[in-house]
C-alpha cells in the first residue's frame, strides 16, 4: 500500500468517536517528530489537540484537521465493520475515510515529504489537529485559538482538509463559511381545558404570528459568494399529548446560517426585538457556534486555485457553502483560510468511503500547495 493509504487505514482502525482521539494523535506526533517537527500536546478535559511545527518565523502556514469522527450508527447497517478499513473495487470504506482521516493522513505524508525535500524552507509549516470537531467544539480548536491569541501566535494561511470536493477531488475550493447561531425559545402560556379557552392562554396561538414572521423574513440578499442568510425552525414541542388540554408552554428550536452582513449580537438583538413586538412572555437561550469568515482574493486563494486547476484541468468552483468548520476559529486570528479535501458525498453516512486513487493523489496536492507558499 502507499504511505497515505497505509496511514489512513491505521487511523480508521482507531475508533475515535468524538471526543475520544483513540491514540490517533500519538501515532501522528511520532511520525511528525521523526520528520523533524516540534510537537506540543494541548489536551483540555477529554479533548486532545496537537500543534506540530517545522521551521521558524513568518509566513506561518497551518494544515488544520480533526482526528475525531461521528458515531457509526448500527454496525449491522454497514457492509463491513466501520472501524475495519476495507478496499472494494478501488474504494476504501470506513468511518472517517472522507471526514477526515484521509485528509489528516495526507497532511502528514505531505509534511514529511515537503520537509525532506526542503529542510530549510521559508517560514513555518504547522499541523494543528483536534479530537473535538464533530462534537461540542469547545475544548478543541476554539480553545487552541484562544491560547494562540493570548500568546500572540501569528497565522498567515490555513488550509483545512474538510471534504470540500463534490464529484471529483479538487473540483471545489472553499473560500469561506457562513456563521451559525442557534436558539431555544420557550413561550409561556396558561394550561387549561380546550372547552374553556377564556381561562387559559395558548402559547402556540400566541407564538404563531411571530414564528411566521421569522420564517418568512428575508434577512439580506447575500454577500459576495455567500447565499442569503437563512433561519430554519428545526423543532417545535408543546402539549401533554392529550387533545383536550391547552398547553402551558411552547418550546421552539431554530438555527440561523448567516453571511458577513451580520454578526451574532446583531441577529440576537433583531430577533429579540421582533419577539417583543408580539407581546410574548418568553425566554430565549442562544448558542453561538461561530461567526462567518471569508477569504478574499489574495496569495492563498490564488495559489490554491492554480494548484487545483492543474490537478483537474479546469478552474475549480469557489464556494462558501456547507456547514461550519474549525477554520471559523482560526480566521479571527487574521489568517486567510481555505478548505481543500476529498469528495463529501458519503460523509456521516453508513459505508462512508473515498476512492483510493483520489486519496493517493491528495498528499501531492497538499505538498504542491505548501511548496508554492513556503519555497
From Swiss-Prot:
<protein>
    <recommendedName>
        <fullName>Succinyl-diaminopimelate desuccinylase</fullName>
        <ecNumber>3.5.1.18</ecNumber>
    </recommendedName>
</protein>
<feature type="binding site">
    <location>
        <position position="66"/>
    </location>
    <ligand>
        <name>Zn(2+) 1</name>
    </ligand>
</feature>
<keyword id="KW-0170">Cobalt</keyword>
<keyword id="KW-0220">Diaminopimelate biosynthesis</keyword>
<feature type="binding site">
    <location>
        <position position="162"/>
    </location>
    <ligand>
        <name>Zn(2+) 1</name>
    </ligand>
</feature>
<comment type="subunit">
    <text>Homodimer.</text>
</comment>
<dbReference type="InterPro" id="IPR001261">
    <property type="entry name" value="ArgE/DapE_CS"/>
</dbReference>
<feature type="binding site">
    <location>
        <position position="99"/>
    </location>
    <ligand>
        <name>Zn(2+) 2</name>
    </ligand>
</feature>
<dbReference type="GO" id="GO:0009014">
    <property type="term" value="F:succinyl-diaminopimelate desuccinylase activity"/>
</dbReference>
<feature type="active site">
    <location>
        <position position="68"/>
    </location>
</feature>
<dbReference type="GO" id="GO:0006526">
    <property type="term" value="P:L-arginine biosynthetic process"/>
</dbReference>
<feature type="binding site">
    <location>
        <position position="134"/>
    </location>
    <ligand>
        <name>Zn(2+) 2</name>
    </ligand>
</feature>
<comment type="similarity">
    <text>Belongs to the peptidase M20A family. DapE subfamily.</text>
</comment>
<keyword id="KW-0862">Zinc</keyword>
<dbReference type="Pfam" id="PF07687">
    <property type="entry name" value="M20_dimer"/>
</dbReference>
<keyword id="KW-0028">Amino-acid biosynthesis</keyword>
<keyword id="KW-0479">Metal-binding</keyword>
<dbReference type="GO" id="GO:0008270">
    <property type="term" value="F:zinc ion binding"/>
</dbReference>
<dbReference type="GO" id="GO:0009089">
    <property type="term" value="P:lysine biosynthetic process via diaminopimelate"/>
</dbReference>
<feature type="binding site">
    <location>
        <position position="348"/>
    </location>
    <ligand>
        <name>Zn(2+) 2</name>
    </ligand>
</feature>
<dbReference type="InterPro" id="IPR011650">
    <property type="entry name" value="Peptidase_M20_dimer"/>
</dbReference>
<dbReference type="InterPro" id="IPR050072">
    <property type="entry name" value="Peptidase_M20A"/>
</dbReference>
<dbReference type="GO" id="GO:0019877">
    <property type="term" value="P:diaminopimelate biosynthetic process"/>
</dbReference>
<keyword id="KW-0457">Lysine biosynthesis</keyword>
<dbReference type="Pfam" id="PF01546">
    <property type="entry name" value="Peptidase_M20"/>
</dbReference>
<dbReference type="InterPro" id="IPR036264">
    <property type="entry name" value="Bact_exopeptidase_dim_dom"/>
</dbReference>
<dbReference type="GO" id="GO:0050897">
    <property type="term" value="F:cobalt ion binding"/>
</dbReference>
<dbReference type="InterPro" id="IPR002933">
    <property type="entry name" value="Peptidase_M20"/>
</dbReference>
<dbReference type="GO" id="GO:0008777">
    <property type="term" value="F:acetylornithine deacetylase activity"/>
</dbReference>
<keyword id="KW-0378">Hydrolase</keyword>
<feature type="binding site">
    <location>
        <position position="99"/>
    </location>
    <ligand>
        <name>Zn(2+) 1</name>
    </ligand>
</feature>
<comment type="function">
    <text>Catalyzes the hydrolysis of N-succinyl-L,L-diaminopimelic acid (SDAP), forming succinate and LL-2,6-diaminopimelate (DAP), an intermediate involved in the bacterial biosynthesis of lysine and meso-diaminopimelic acid, an essential component of bacterial cell walls.</text>
</comment>
<comment type="pathway">
    <text>Amino-acid biosynthesis; L-lysine biosynthesis via DAP pathway; LL-2,6-diaminopimelate from (S)-tetrahydrodipicolinate (succinylase route): step 3/3.</text>
</comment>
<feature type="active site" description="Proton acceptor">
    <location>
        <position position="133"/>
    </location>
</feature>
<dbReference type="InterPro" id="IPR005941">
    <property type="entry name" value="DapE_proteobac"/>
</dbReference>
Amino acid at each position: 500500500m502507499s504511505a497515505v493509504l497505509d496511514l489512513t487505514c491505521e487511523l480508521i482502525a482507531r475508533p475515535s468517536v468524538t471526543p475520544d482521539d483513540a491514540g490517533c494523535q500519538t501515532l501522528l506526533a511520532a511520525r511528525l517528530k521523526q520528520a523533524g517537527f516540534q510537537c506540543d500536546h494541548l489536551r483540555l478535559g477529554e479533548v486532545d489537540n496537537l500543534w506540530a511545527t517545522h521551521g521558524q518565523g513568518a509566513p506561518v502556514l497551518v494544515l488544520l484537521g480533526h482526528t475525531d469522527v461521528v458515531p457509526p450508527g448500527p454496525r449491522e447497517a454497514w457492509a463491513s465493520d466501520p472501524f475495519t478499513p476495507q478496499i472494494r473495487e478501488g474504494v476504501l470504506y470506513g468511518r472517517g475515510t472522507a471526514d477526515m482521516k484521509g485528509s489528516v493522513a495526507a497532511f502528514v505524508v505531505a509534511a514529511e515529504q515537503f520537509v525532506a525535500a526542503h529542510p530549510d524552507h521559508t517560514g513555518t509549516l504547522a499541523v494543528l489537529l483536534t479530537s473535538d470537531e464533530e462534537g461540542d467544539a469547545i475544548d478543541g480548536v476554539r480553545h487552541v485559538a484562544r491560547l494562540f491569541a493570548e500568546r500572540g501566535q501569528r497565522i498567515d494561511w490555513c488550509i483545512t482538509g474538510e471534504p470540500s470536493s463534490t464529484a471529483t477531488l479538487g473540483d471545489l475550493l472553499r473560500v469561506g463559511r457562513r456563521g451559525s447561531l442557534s436558539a431555544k425559545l420557550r413561550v409561556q402560556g396558561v394550561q387549561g381545558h380546550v372547552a374553556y379557552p377564556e381561562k387559559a392562554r395558548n402559547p402556540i396561538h400566541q407564538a404563531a404570528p411571530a414564528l411566521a414572521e421569522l420564517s418568512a423574513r428575508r434577512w439580506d440578499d447575500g454577500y459576495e459568494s455567500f447565499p442569503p442568510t437563512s433561519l430554519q425552525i428545526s423543532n417545535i414541542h408543546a402539549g401533554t399529548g392529550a387533545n383536550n388540554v391547552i398547553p402551558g408552554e411552547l418550546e421552539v428550536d431554530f438555527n440561523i446560517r448567516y453571511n458577513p452582513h451580520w454578526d451574532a449580537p446583531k441577529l440576537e438583538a433583531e430577533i429579540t426585538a421582533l419577539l417583543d413586538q408580539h407581546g410574548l412572555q418568553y425566554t430565549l437561550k442562544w448558542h453561538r457556534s461561530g461567526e462567518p469568515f471569508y477569504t478574499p482574493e489574495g496569495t492563498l486563494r490564488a495559489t490554491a486555485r492554480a494548484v487545483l486547476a492543474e490537478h483537474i484541468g479546469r478552474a475549480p468552483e469557489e464556494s462558501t457553502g456547507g456547514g461550519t468548520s474549525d477554520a471559523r476559529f482560526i480566521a479571527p486570528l487574521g489568517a486567510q483560510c481555505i478548505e481543500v479535501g476529498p469528495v463529501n458525498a458519503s460523509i456521516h453516512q453508513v459505508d462512508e468511503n473515498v476512492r483510493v486513487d483520489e486519496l493517493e493523489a491528495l498528499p501531492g496536492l497538499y505538498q504542491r500547495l505548501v511548496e508554492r507558499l513556503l519555497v
